[in-house]
């Protein structure tokens, strides 16, 4: 049998490709507005497209992920390659906002295919190392842009944003298809040594399907927490270049930020995933989310004081944000088992779609109406703080029970 780590790193490559469609977007927003000035496009118009891109992917994941548990990931990976190539590759030739929204949404569905496959590979093949395996997979999504953002920026300057969309769409789509060729679900009855499971982690012995999960209140608690912590990082992802322009940050500093923030984003997933396997998911979430709130507030004042401080704060924002995409799937696997992990997580991941609309279009609209990014940053910080406090309550609520089981009124706190 092929080593499970080979499958994990193949999924990692696919995640790098789709990550660029999200984390390189900030480079394209202003060139698109400028190119369509004759149609009176504004920043908020194109940023709504970013929100719809993420929403389309996250909201279709439950339908896509159901195929992984039944047929395996290869078909979805091939489908993703086509959707990403067509959707992303055509964005430079749109003639209206409607076609722009539709094509970026198509790319978003392609992204969802790969994301569902990647998370499934981590949780299914690594029930003993969910934190670190999920961290590696989601790090590819967040970290890959560190290598590609300078290339994207250079291509936009030399061949224009339209051709950059086209050629990167084709190459990314092809690499996604190739990465999917080695991905399969583990065999029936696949298990790992029980001794490898860490005692700090609460885990359920039962596997829940999506309908059983949706009937438990714990799921909606996690959904709200993920929604609130997701907004700040998605806002900075979409608005990094416009914010830098408003803060009068130099081009060199922006280039450095475009490299370091994806590295911080990806590193946060591995770092906090590893910590969570020992410290516990809930304490890790509380610590990281609280720091996220602090750094978002600091960005409104200290971020304006100079290039160095801007870069440092943006790096810290991403270093305390990316972990949500490893901690929540790992926690969901702890609560509801790994058998139906792909489909189960797709429902929780849909929270990102709502967060993207708040962090992209609404944040840009607030800036256009008020002339400052402070409202968007401080509002995101308040929500991150609320999510941090909710993480403390996760430690005290009981593990979910199936409807046929007696519901326990007290659950020992672990970690």
What are these regions (language model features)?
Residues 25-30, 211-270:
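Extracytoplasmic gate region of multi-pass secondary transporters
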Residues 27-59, 252-256:
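Extracellular/periplasmic helix-loop-helix junction of adjacent transmembrane segments
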Residues 32, 113-126, 134, 323-336:
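Intracellular juxtamembrane helix-capping segments at the cytosolic ends
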Residues 32-33, 67-68, 147-159, 244-245, ...:
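Interfacial helix-cap and linker-helix signal at transmembrane-aqueous boundaries
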Residues 51-66, 259-271:
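Central cavity-lining transmembrane alpha-helices of secondary-active solute carriers
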Residues 141-188:
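Helix-loop-helix hairpin linking two adjacent transmembrane segments in secondary transporters
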